[in-house]
């Protein structure tokens, strides 16, 4: 597969046409931003960490029945994906109160949200991604009621799958952002799932394991990304088979 003309460039990713119809290449760059681009830097290897984690999550979700745009990795920072007609919505699933929900509502940070709260924002930097309700989404013709229902169901399924997966690695999935697109009438998960788009806390220490480290100057963000990427993608050990209790000689004699 050959990478062709640039189609789109965002804050931290670039999307390219390819010589295969219906397939694009997403390049995860080493750029990192916060506060609508008000804070930005370029950090070596950041793109490869996010690409690797995204590929890992996409593959895991595909195995568990979630359709994603991911096809295969091209190298450590580029992946081939299905070309989708993206829906300009950011779907945020919140399991614990943190970030903007604490600033805007009377929640204490770390409060469990049961059931999980789904917030949908209009993906538009010029308007600072305003929050939408279902009626506004339909009125703006961004998605149909049936598509919205489907998107929310997929988001909750992803939340269940990833919360369980991360818990095994001692990580709490606080909240995360998803983006979806269409191919025909089918809804696919697009964009990325990485430390840039998730809020993760260490279960034991409460330490931030995501872009908040960069956002709020909590430490070395690249050391964090490196450590978290290795932790998330670490192969799962199969459950140990239960050992059968040894049969005593007395039991053998009684059964003869």
Curated annotation (Swiss-Prot):
GO terms for molecular function: ATP binding; phosphoribosylaminoimidazolesuccinocarboxamide synthase activity. It is an enzyme of class 6 (ligase). Residues 240-256 have a biased composition (Basic residues). Residues 234-256 are annotated as: Disordered. Its EC number is 6.3.2.6. Disulfide bonds: none annotated. One of its GO terms (biological process) is cobalamin biosynthetic process. Signal peptide: none annotated. It comes from the Archaea. It catalyses: 5-amino-1-(5-phospho-D-ribosyl)imidazole-4-carboxylate + L-aspartate + ATP = (2S)-2-[5-amino-1-(5-phospho-beta-D-ribosyl)imidazole-4-carboxamido]succinate + ADP + phosphate + 2 H(+). Pathway: Purine metabolism; IMP biosynthesis via de novo pathway; 5-amino-1-(5-phospho-D-ribosyl)imidazole-4-carboxamide from 5-amino-1-(5-phospho-D-ribosyl)imidazole-4-carboxylate: step 1/2. Keywords: ATP-binding, Ligase, Nucleotide-binding, Purine biosynthesis. PANTHER family: MULTIFUNCTIONAL PROTEIN ADE2, SI:DKEY-6E2.2. NCBIfam families: purC. Belongs to the SAICAR synthetase family. This is Phosphoribosylaminoimidazole-succinocarboxamide synthase. It comes from Methanoregula boonei (strain DSM 21154 / JCM 14090 / 6A8). The lineage of its organism: Archaea, Methanobacteriati, Methanobacteriota, Stenosarchaea group, Methanomicrobia. The gene is purC.
């Amino acid at each position: 597969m050959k990478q062709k003309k640039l189609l789109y460039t965002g804050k931290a990713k670039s999307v390219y046409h390819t010589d295969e119809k219906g397939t694009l290449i997403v390049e995860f760059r080493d750029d990192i931003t916060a506060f609508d681009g008000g804070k930005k830097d370029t950090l070596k290897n950041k793109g490869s960490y996010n690409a690797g984690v995204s590929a890992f999550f996409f593959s895991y979700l595909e195995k568990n029945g979630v359709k994603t745009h991911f096809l295969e990795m091209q190298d450590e920072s580029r992946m081939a994906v299905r070309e989708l007609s993206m829906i300009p919505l950011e779907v945020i699933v919140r399991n614990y109160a943190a970030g903007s929900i604490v600033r805007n509502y009377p929640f204490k940070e770390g409060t469990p949200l049961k059931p999980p709260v789904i917030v949908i924002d209009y993906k538009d930097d010029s308007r600072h991604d305003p929050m939408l309700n279902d009626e506004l989404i339909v009125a703006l013709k961004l998605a149909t009621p049936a598509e919205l229902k489907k998107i929310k169901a997929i988001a909750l399924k992803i939340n269940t799958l990833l919360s369980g997966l991360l818990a095994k690695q001692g990580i709490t999935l606080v909240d995360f952002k998803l983006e979806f697109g269409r191919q025909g009438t089918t809804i696919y998960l697009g964009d990325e799932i990485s430390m840039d788009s998730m809020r993760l806390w260490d279960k034991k220490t409460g330490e931030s394991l995501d872009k908040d480290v960069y956002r709020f100057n909590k430490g070395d963000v690249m050391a964090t990304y490196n450590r978290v990427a290795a932790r998330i993608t670490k192969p799962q050990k199969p459950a140990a088979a239960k050992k059968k209790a040894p049969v005593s000689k007395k039991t053998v004699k009684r059964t003869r």
